[in-house]
């Protein structure tokens, strides 16, 4: 299927993402809104397609990392509220104001200038104020300053103070003491603002780890990221969601050769055959997202059998040992992660080998890998980023 695109491709099952979203809604309840995090091209899954599916199924808000990501969604006709989680330079704010994008704010001078930009356009800039309760990134750490400046922000022309938020550093770890401290700091900030008569509609701090483990932190809205895509943030959280991985990473065998014992494979001769072997070449490498650290350190699926990567992963090609695979042929499907004949390899499995997190595995799949989208049980689109 889809012979007109590269043998190396990703299949994204949007039905799985919708299922995961509904699982999150089931856990947090109808009172709590959901902000679907689609930054970094929806963790490599495709921001537009994921956002569209989430909006069609009732997500309340979307979140991205940069102004460019927000404007990309607007260019595709996504009209749902979109929060830029990171800093937006004022030099880039004008179009975002026009397109009703929501800004993260943590400085009064910045917000005043943003309000002036919005007023000149006859608009109000919507902001969510960021409080750093212990992550160590952007956001107010001086709470006395924060409450004074936020009160002033709430009175500015050209500004709509819609939200306030923070981010957990350790919600996915076994020890929840630090996460609890962070929440208490955030709750203290909210009380201070209430005393000043500052009413803020959306208060949010719960990421994926907090959704599973810290139900007291749900507040008005939760911000699932990795759980939308079918992975837990760590092995230490409660597995209360029926998650379905949404991505399959696949390629095909393009060449098979039989080699004798003592044949070296790939750069550096890190693998030398110990027997007469069948070695298959795959048109996939670290430039596609198959990490070089998986050299001699990962198995893929061919005809329902686990077979090893042999030798170093190259930039564009990789070799596997298919000696034990009966009837193997050029053109056979190879699963890097995903399912085949009832067997599964997950992004989480790969992340463990790389001593990282599944987020990085998903995000590492490059733009030269086409995405095939499945929605409502059917293939409905193919995205080839390199097609002109």
Curated annotation (Swiss-Prot):
UniProt keyword annotation of Nucleotide-binding present: no
Binding-site positions, substrate: 137, 315
Cofactors that this protein relies on: pyridoxal 5'-phosphate
GO molecular function, one term: pyridoxal phosphate binding
Active site as annotated: 39, 267
Catalytic reactions of this protein: L-alanine = D-alanine
Gene Ontology cellular component terms for the protein in this record: cytosol
Enzyme class of the recorded protein, top EC level: isomerase
SS bonds (residue pairs): none
Entry-linked CDD domains: PLPDE_III_AR
Pfam families (alphabetical): Ala_racemase_C, Ala_racemase_N
BP terms from Gene Ontology: D-alanine biosynthetic process; peptidoglycan biosynthetic process
UniProt-listed Enzyme Commission number(s): 5.1.1.1
UniProt keyword annotations, A-Z: Isomerase, Pyridoxal phosphate
Residues annotated with N6-(pyridoxal phosphate)lysine modification: 39
Pathway given in the UniProt record: Amino-acid biosynthesis; D-alanine biosynthesis; D-alanine from L-alanine: step 1/1
Function field: Catalyzes the interconversion of L-alanine and D-alanine. May also act on other amino acids.
Family of the protein in this entry: Belongs to the alanine racemase family.
NCBIfam families reported in the protein's UniProt record: alr
Protein name, UniProt field: Alanine racemase 2
UniProt lineage: Bacteria, Bacillati, Bacillota, Clostridia, Thermoanaerobacterales
């Amino acid at each position: 299927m889809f012979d007109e695109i590269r043998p190396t491709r990703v299949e994204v099952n949007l039905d799985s993402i919708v299922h995961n979203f509904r699982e999150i809604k089931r856990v947090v309840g109808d009172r709590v809104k959901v902000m679907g995090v689609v930054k970094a091209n929806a963790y490599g899954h495709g921001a537009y397609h994921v956002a569209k599916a989430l909006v069609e199924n009732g997500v309340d808000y979307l979140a991205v990392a940069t102004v460019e990501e927000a404007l990309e969604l607007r260019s595709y006709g996504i009209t749902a509220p979109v929060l830029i989680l990171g800093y937006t330079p004022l030099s880039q704010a004008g179009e975002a104001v026009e397109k009703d994008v929501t800004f993260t704010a943590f400085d009064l001078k910045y917000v005043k200038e943003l309000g002036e930009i919005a007023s000149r356009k006859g608009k109000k800039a919507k902001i969510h104020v960021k409080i750093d309760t212990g992550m160590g990134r952007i956001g107010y750490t001086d709470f006395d300053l924060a409450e004074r400046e936020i009160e002033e922000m709430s009175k500015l022309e050209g500004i709509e103070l819609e939200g306030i938020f923070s981010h957990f550093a350790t919600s996915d770890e076994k020890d929840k003491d630090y996460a609890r401290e962070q929440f208490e700091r955030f709750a203290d900030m909210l009380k201070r603002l209430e005393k000043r008569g500052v009413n803020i509609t959306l208060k949010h701090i719960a990421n994926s780890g907090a959704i599973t483990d810290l139900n007291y932190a749900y507040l008005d809205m939760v911000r699932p990221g990795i759980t939308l895509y079918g992975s837990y943030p760590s092995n230490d959280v409660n597995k209360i969601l029926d998650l379905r991985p949404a991505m399959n990473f696949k390629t095909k065998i393009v060449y098979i050769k039989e080699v004798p014992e003592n044949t070296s494979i790939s750069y550096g001769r890190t693998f030398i055959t110990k027997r007469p072997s069948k070695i298959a070449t795959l048109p996939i490498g670290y430039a596609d997202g198959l990490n070089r650290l998986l050299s001699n350190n990962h198995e893929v699926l061919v005809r329902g059998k686990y077979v090893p990567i042999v030798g170093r992963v190259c930039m564009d090609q990789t070799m596997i040992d298919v000696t034990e695979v009966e009837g193997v042929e050029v053109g056979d499907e190879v699963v890097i992660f995903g399912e085949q004949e009832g067997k599964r390899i997950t992004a989480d499995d790969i992340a463990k080998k790389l001593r990282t997190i599944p987020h990085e595995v998903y995000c590492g799949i490059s733009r030269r890998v086409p995405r095939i989208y499945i929605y409502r049980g059917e293939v409905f689109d193919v995205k080839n980023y390199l097609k002109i």
